[in-house]
């Protein structure tokens, strides 16, 4: 009898030890992910493609589906411009990543207010929210347009300070143990530079510096007019896909993605000591199946600046048009967009001329003062002049307004000029 009890006890120990190293690692129950494609419209195909691909990678690595929260407008897969109805691809191999993706927030629910509510676990978001606690690790991935101090959503913008304040709230309320953020957007570094504390267990990387464009890739598909991926996003997703994440650190991925994303300068912010941690703590620890990557990932090609994509996509639609009527209509639209681009440029030049007559402040603003100023100024500019969602190319000019705030000009003076120029 004694030997039977002893044998059962030993067997239990062995089974527990085996379970700790099984593919369904119990530790994966303490991982949460929030994936955000912040755009809509077929010319922004790549953002939803990035999120769909990332979703499948996290699932394959062991993150529980109930712990993945997705934001996607969901207007791409069944878009009339999509020659492959019901499918979304992320490179020229045309592997469908849309199938199986559970979208928690779509359409008008893809907005900054709901996003911040989800992060805080606020049930007023109306759907799945982050329920992480002090022992949980969180991964946030965002892809869309950006400008200094903002990330764009379909109808509104997320400003840097409210985002950083939300992250601080999560820390104060012990809503995570460690948190990692990846951001794909033009000027994405401006969301964190000088703003993200280095002592709250948050590690962030961005596709670009605070003052440069990010890049799209796979932009010349023979049948799809839009770009299929973002360069930084595709690089990190494929890097996670092909490696065993229990043996690959955050810094190893950062350095590899920085090397591969050779058209912009990938940046790193926050607690850089976290770079020694393994990716498995945030993206899952399951071993890849032996057949999972028989076909090696594609090398990104045909990359262009994100700001040039609206015109690039329109040029490709003209080339792919099946009849002269469609081609003529698209040519007219192209002409209007080129005129709009010139109008934006002229508008910013006139604003510069008016600002020349405003007395220059004696000292520059602090980073906090700059962010407070630019939030007010951007809202006025988008109300009176142009919205990012209507004219993504304005992101290349908004740095002008940011620079005025940075130099210490008051939001009141800048907005006074904006009203003179744009009415």
UniProtKB/Swiss-Prot annotation:
The protein's role, per its UniProt record: This protease is used by the parasite for degradation of the host globin.
GO MF term list: cysteine-type endopeptidase activity
Family as reported in the entry's similarity comment: Belongs to the peptidase C13 family.
Domain of life: Eukaryota
Residue spans of biased composition, Basic and acidic residues class: 289-305
Maturation-removed propeptide residues: 19-29, 286-423
PANTHER family assigned: HEMOGLOBINASE FAMILY MEMBER, LEGUMAIN
Expressed in which tissues: Gut.
Identification of the protein by name: Hemoglobinase
Active site residues per record: 145, 186
Annotated signal sequence range: 1-18
Statement: the UniProt record of this protein carries the keyword Hydrolase: yes
Recorded catalytic activity of this chain's protein: Hydrolysis of proteins and small molecule substrates at -Asn-|-Xaa- bonds
């Amino acid at each position: 009898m004694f030997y039977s009890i002893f044998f059962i006890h030993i067997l239990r120990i062995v089974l527990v030890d085996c379970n700790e190293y099984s593919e369904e690692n119990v530790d994966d129950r303490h991982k949460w992910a929030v994936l955000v494609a912040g755009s809509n419209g077929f010319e922004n195909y790549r953002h939803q493609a990035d999120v769909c691909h990332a979703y499948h990678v996290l699932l394959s690595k062991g993150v529980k589906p109930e712990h993945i929260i997705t934001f996607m407008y969901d207007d791409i897969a069944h878009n009339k411009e999509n020659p492959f109805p019901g499918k979304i691809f992320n490179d020229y191999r045309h592997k469908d990543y849309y199938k199986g993706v559970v979208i928690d927030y779509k359409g008008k629910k893809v907005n900054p207010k709901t996003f911040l509510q989800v992060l805080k676990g606020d049930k007023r978001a109306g759907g799945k929210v982050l329920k992480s606690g002090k022992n949980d690790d969180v991964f946030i991935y965002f892809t869309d347009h950006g400008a200094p101090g903002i990330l764009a959503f379909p109808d509104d913008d997320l400003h840097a300070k409210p985002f950083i304040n939300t992250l601080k709230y999560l820390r104060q309320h012990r809503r995570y143990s460690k948190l990692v953020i990846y951001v794909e957007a033009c000027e994405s570094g401006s969301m964190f530079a000088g703003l993200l504390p280095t002592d709250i267990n948050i590690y962030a990387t961005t596709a670009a510096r605070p003052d440069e464009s990010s890049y799209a890739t796979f932009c010349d598909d023979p049948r799809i007019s839009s770009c299929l991926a973002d360069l930084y996003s595709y690089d990190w997703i494929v890097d996670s896909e092909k490696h065993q994440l229990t043996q690959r650190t955050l810094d190893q991925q950062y350095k590899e993605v920085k090397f591969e994303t050779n058209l912009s300068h990938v940046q790193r912010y926050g607690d850089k000591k976290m770079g020694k941690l393994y990716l498995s703590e945030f993206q899952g620890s399951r071993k890849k199946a032996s057949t999972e990557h028989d076909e090696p990932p594609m090398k990104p090609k045909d990359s262009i600046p994100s700001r040039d994509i609206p015109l690039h996509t329109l040029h490709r639609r003209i080339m792919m048009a099946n009849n002269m009527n469609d081609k003529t209509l698209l040519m007219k639209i192209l002409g209007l967009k080129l005129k709009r681009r010139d109008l934006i440029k002229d508008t910013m030049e006139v604003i510069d001329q008016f600002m020349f007559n405003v007395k220059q402040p004696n000292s520059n603003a602090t980073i906090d003062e700059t962010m407070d100023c630019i939030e007010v100024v951007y809202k006025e500019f988008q109300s009176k002049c142009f919205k990012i969602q209507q004219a993504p190319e304005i992101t290349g000019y908004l740095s002008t307004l940011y620079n005025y705030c940075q130099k210490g000009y008051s939001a009141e003076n800048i907005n006074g000029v904006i009203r003179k120029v744009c009415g």
